[in-house]
Amino acid sequence: MAKKSMIQKNLRRIKLCDQYRERREELKSIMNNKDLSIAKRFAAQSKLIKKLPRDSSKIRIRNRCALTGRPRGVYRKFGLCRIVLRDLCSFGQVPGVTKSSW
């Protein structure tokens, strides 16, 4: 089980990312627009770095298990770590997943 503070920090980052998504996309489109002058593009880049919170970046979000908060071995399709997924599948609580045999 992960520390509750780490789970809360990740949830706060997800919320910040959603809150600043449009603003960040606007600034990135200005930065990548080759038709604009270098000064405007540089100004957009400095606003992106200085004005927006660091945790509002999507890259800082960590995929965590929905039940335990474990940061490693998380299957994106299920949102669960490998250990919890194995337990739930063995009890038949994940629909459509069966134990393989050949």
UniProtKB/Swiss-Prot annotation:
Top-level taxon: Bacteria
Keyword Transit peptide: no
SUPFAM superfamilies listed in its UniProt record: Glucocorticoid receptor-like (DNA-binding domain)
Keywords assigned: Ribonucleoprotein, Ribosomal protein, RNA-binding, rRNA-binding
Signal peptide: none
Alphabetized InterPro entries for the sequence: Ribosomal_uS14, Ribosomal_uS14_bac/plastid, Ribosomal_uS14_CS
Cellular component aspect of the GO annotation: cytoplasm; small ribosomal subunit
Gene3D superfamilies: 1.10.287.1480
Keyword Ribosomal protein included in the entry's annotation: yes
GO-annotated molecular function: rRNA binding; structural constituent of ribosome
GO BP terms: translation
UniProt record similarity statement: Belongs to the universal ribosomal protein uS14 family.
Function description: Binds 16S rRNA, required for the assembly of 30S particles and may also be responsible for determining the conformation of the 16S rRNA at the A site.
Subunit-structure text: Part of the 30S ribosomal subunit. Contacts proteins S3 and S10.
Stated name of the protein: Small ribosomal subunit protein uS14
Organism: Wolbachia pipientis subsp. Culex pipiens (strain wPip)
